[in-house]
Amino acid sequence: MIVSTKLQDHFEKITKILSGFGVEGCISYGEITFSIRDQRDIHLILKKLKKEYLFEQLTDVTAVDYLTYGQSDWQVGKVVSQTGFSRGRQQDFKTAAVDNRFEIIYQLLSMANNVRIRVKCKLKDAQIILVDSVSDLWPSANWVEREVYDMFGIYFNNHPDLRRVLTDYGFVGHPLRKDFPQTGYVEMRYDENLGRVVYEPVEIDDRVNTPRVIRN
């Protein structure tokens, strides 16, 4: 793939700025990405990027859960008829612990240098996954970090107001985790006798209707 001279120039300059840290970088599909090895360096590295390469805007923070990465919901058998693949056989869904299950991703924009980069870091597995908040660097981080906490259960140290932002305050679990059931845990309805909304355990069976199949 041909990389533009300007993009390559930005990549080399930023790589030089981050040379003292455990960071790996690449240019892929016309985008610059840097991977941080140690999550304890996230705040310092992002602060350095903002100050020394004028990344004055944080456009997004998100995360990825790799718990079931590379696993199929169904195991597809060999072709046994003219109609195509044999019937899918449902298999036990494995949710065994994986190393560095979660990855956090930051999208940065420098309007002064007209360049965007992606900075990501695999997070160490722990009962409480904790990352330093960057809301002191970019006010825009406040709500997107709350969203990551709400959806993935990743906590942000020194965040000014780490509360759920998309789900109810009494919500159980984190919906974008791979081990969160698609049906959820509770459902709500309006109870005419009580005159209010009530929560009840879901009565829907959690099953795979459109399976993810990986054919190698």
UniProtKB/Swiss-Prot annotation:
Keywords: Cell inner membrane, Cell membrane, Membrane, NAD, Quinone, Translocase, Transport, Ubiquinone. Its EC number is 7.1.1.-. GO terms for cellular component: plasma membrane. InterPro entries: NADH_DH_suC, NADH_quin_OxRdtase_su_C/D-like, NADH_UbQ_OxRdtase_30kDa_su, NADH_UbQ_OxRdtase_CS. Signal peptide: none annotated. It is found in: Cell inner membrane. Its main location: membrane. GO terms for molecular function: NADH dehydrogenase (ubiquinone) activity; NADH:ubiquinone reductase (non-electrogenic) activity; quinone binding. SUPFAM superfamilies: Nqo5-like (SSF143243). Gene3D superfamilies: NADH:ubiquinone oxidoreductase, 30kDa subunit. It is a peripheral membrane protein. It catalyses: a quinone + NADH + 5 H(+)(in) = a quinol + NAD(+) + 4 H(+)(out). NDH-1 is composed of 14 different subunits. Subunits NuoB, C, D, E, F, and G constitute the peripheral sector of the complex. Belongs to the complex I 30 kDa subunit family. NDH-1 shuttles electrons from NADH, via FMN and iron-sulfur (Fe-S) centers, to quinones in the respiratory chain. The immediate electron acceptor for the enzyme in this species is believed to be ubiquinone. Couples the redox reaction to proton translocation (for every two electrons transferred, four hydrogen ions are translocated across the cytoplasmic membrane), and thus conserves the redox energy in a proton gradient. This is NADH-quinone oxidoreductase subunit C. It comes from Francisella tularensis subsp. holarctica (strain FTNF002-00 / FTA).
